[in-house]
Amino acid sequence: MIEAIIREDKLNDVKDALRTIGIMGMNVAEIRGHGRQGGIVLSGRSGSYQVDLLPKIQINIVLSEDNVDETVKTIVASARSGSNGEAGDGLIFILPVDEVVRIRTGERGHDAVMYPGDIDERKGKKK
């Protein structure tokens, strides 16, 4: 499983890029957090104030292990700010998944996460 934490304004770029490589299923959540940048200082009518927890997007994708590298490269390329990136661009975690069960059908494992037209079908892998 890939868990990516990205900037809010990069979500559409990342989704579009993932779709081009055949990633059809993902979960997306709005979250708040900070990393090395530690938040930002905003200025308003009443003065400036520190915002410690910044809005971010969390994307979770369950996929075959042999598709992880291509997917990570795609996320990095589409989520990075500018040519060299910036603090706050995000992180990608690669995690093991012990088992997947599709609730509707009871399918398990790889069959539970395959979609018509997805990355595995594009690579010629069948159910």
What are these regions (language model features)?
Residues 1-127:
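Positively charged, small/polar-rich N-terminal and surface patches that mediate targeting and assembly
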